[in-house]
Structures are given as structure tokens and as C-alpha cells.
């Protein structure tokens, strides 16, 4: 975009409290034309700031109140991370099949543990899509979910992962932001799927892959809109087809044979629209399809 470093002001580790409002106001007072809030709990504070600074664009990740706020300078954005979670579930399901084939587990003991942050829609849709991906490869797979009630709690995530393993889970995944769960899996020799980043640095013998976000797609788009003087969408969401989500490289030392080829096949199907993670085509209401009802 041709911006210089002094045109970008960054604030990190902003809590989900009044500090978020203070940070947003400070950025606006510094002359920022567009401000991004990147944690779910920042939204109400960004809404407050947006009402006070109508000439500044405020963009909030993972939120939902922009459309109902009536503020033309308030925007919500997220990517279709559920698509990447589905693909990472395929990786996990293939690993379970490999463990069944080599006698490490049986079909009846193919149980996944999921370390969730909060019982929010974002987390629920994420583990649902992950489970659908796993089930597409290993139909006998079951899954148990436990929450830490925090986005980032290293010890809490490690503790929940250990509890899930003690409860019979033979593979762990997560929607939480630290390396706590993968570290536990490495110690206990249990395969895992991480989140956000490649976990092989902390779990080289356990990590399979991680679904990951490419926020740069949105940041580039939104900032370009400001530069061009064009409107930013109130709600924005893109996925694999636009490069907004992906999975980290498959750890060949842990993954099942043939995983790379299957992942390519599934990703291409999502991109061309032949595979829908949440396929409602077979849903009916009183015998009528949703399409007919609409």
C-alpha cells in the first residue's frame, strides 16, 4: 500500500475493558484514520469511540454489532476460519484412521478432546466444523469439549488438555491462543491440532497442523478503501478462496500417509464451491427444503 512505518501505530495487550476505549480514543487523537480492534470484548468500547469520532473508521474483529449500531463508520470483520478448521479436522480424522490401522486405538476409542476458550458462537462453530472434518474421514470419531473461559491461559489450557487425555481422548485440538495444550500433548505423546501458528516448535512429535488466519487480506482491503475514499463493508467475511484462511504445513513426521493429497483435494472443493462445510441442502422443515421455504 506504500505506507511508511510512522503511518502505522500499534497498541498491544489491550484488555477487554475500558482500556480498549482509552486506546481507541488515543489513536483517534493521534490522527489515525482507521482503527482496528482485534479481540471480541473490545467491541462495545469501539462502538463508544466510533460514536464520538464519526470521521474515523473503526473495524472490529469477530464482532456482530456494527450493522445494528447505525454507525456508518463501524465495521465488523472475520474470516471463514471454520473452513480451515474443517480441513484441520480432515487431517485429524486421517490420523485417527492411521492409529486404528496400526492398533494404537480401536474404532470405539477414537475420541477427540477439544480445548475451547468460551462457549461462544465463534468457538462452537469452530469445533463443529473441525468435528465434521474429522468425521468425514473417521466416522466412528467422538469428541469431548471443555472450556478454559479465557482466550489465552497457558496453564489453564495445559490443564484442560491433560484432563481430556485422562478422560480417554487420543487426539487434542483447540480454540485457545497459547501453546499450553500442544506442550501437554508433546509430553504425553498425544497428537494434536493447534491454532493460529505452527505448533511444531513446541510439539515436534505431536503437532499435526493448525488452522490459521490471514488478517492481511482484510487489513489491505480496509486501508485501501480509506485511501481510495470508498466505503468499507459493514460486515466482511472471506475464506480459502480469497486466501483469508489456511492451515500451517502438515507435519509429515506425525501425520498419516496421504494427508497432503487429501488436504489439497478438500481445499480445492471448498474453493470451487463443491464442498460446503455447513451443508443445509438436506435440511427440511415439515417436509419442505429450506430453499423452497425461502
Where are the regions a protein language model picked out?
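A residue-level marker of the well-folded mature domains of exported/periplasmic proteins
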Residues: 1-294
Amino acid at each position: 500500500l506504500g505506507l511508511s512505518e510512522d503511518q502505522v501505530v500499534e497498541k498491544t495487550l489491550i484488555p477487554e475493558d475500558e482500556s480498549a476505549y482509552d486506546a481507541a480514543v488515543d489513536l483517534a487523537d493521534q490522527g489515525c484514520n482507521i482503527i482496528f480492534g482485534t479481540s471480541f470484548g473490545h467491541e462495545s468500547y469501539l462502538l463508544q469511540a466510533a460514536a464520538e469520532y464519526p470521521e474515523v473508521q473503526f473495524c472490529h474483529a469477530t464482532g456482530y454489532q456494527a450493522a445494528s449500531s447505525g454507525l456508518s463508520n463501524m465495521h465488523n470483520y472475520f474470516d471463514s476460519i471454520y473452513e480451515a478448521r474443517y480441513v484441520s479436522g480432515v487431517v485429524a480424522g486421517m490420523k485417527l484412521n492411521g492409529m486404528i490401522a496400526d492398533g494404537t486405538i480401536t474404532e470405539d476409542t477414537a475420541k477427540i478432546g477439544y480445548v475451547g476458550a468460551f462457549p461462544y458462537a465463534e468457538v462452537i462453530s469452530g469445533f463443529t466444523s473441525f468435528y465434521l472434518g474429522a468425521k468425514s474421514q473417521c466416522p466412528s470419531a467422538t469428541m469431548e469439549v471443555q472450556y478454559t473461559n479465557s482466550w489465552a491461559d497457558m496453564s489453564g489450557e495445559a490443564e484442560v488438555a491433560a484432563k481430556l487425555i485422562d478422560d480417554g481422548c487420543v487426539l487434542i485440538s483447540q480454540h485457545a491462543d497459547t501453546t499450553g495444550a500442544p506442550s501437554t500433548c508433546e509430553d504425553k505423546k498425544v497428537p494434536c491440532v493447534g491454532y493460529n501458528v505452527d505448533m511444531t516448535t513446541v510439539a515436534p512429535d505431536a503437532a499435526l497442523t493448525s488452522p490459521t488466519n490471514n488478517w492481511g487480506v482484510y487489513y489491505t482491503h480496509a486501508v485501501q478503501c480509506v485511501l481510495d475514499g470508498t466505503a468499507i463493508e459493514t460486515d466482511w467475511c472471506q475464506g480459502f478462496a480469497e486466501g483469508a484462511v489456511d492451515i500451517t504445513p502438515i507435519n509429515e513426521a506425525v501425520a498419516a500417509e496421504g494427508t497432503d493429497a487429501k488436504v489439497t483435494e478438500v481445499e480445492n472443493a471448498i474453493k470451487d464451491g463443491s464442498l460446503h462445510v455447513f451443508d443445509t441442502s438436506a435440511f427440511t422443515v415439515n417436509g419442505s427444503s429450506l430453499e423452497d421455504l425461502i
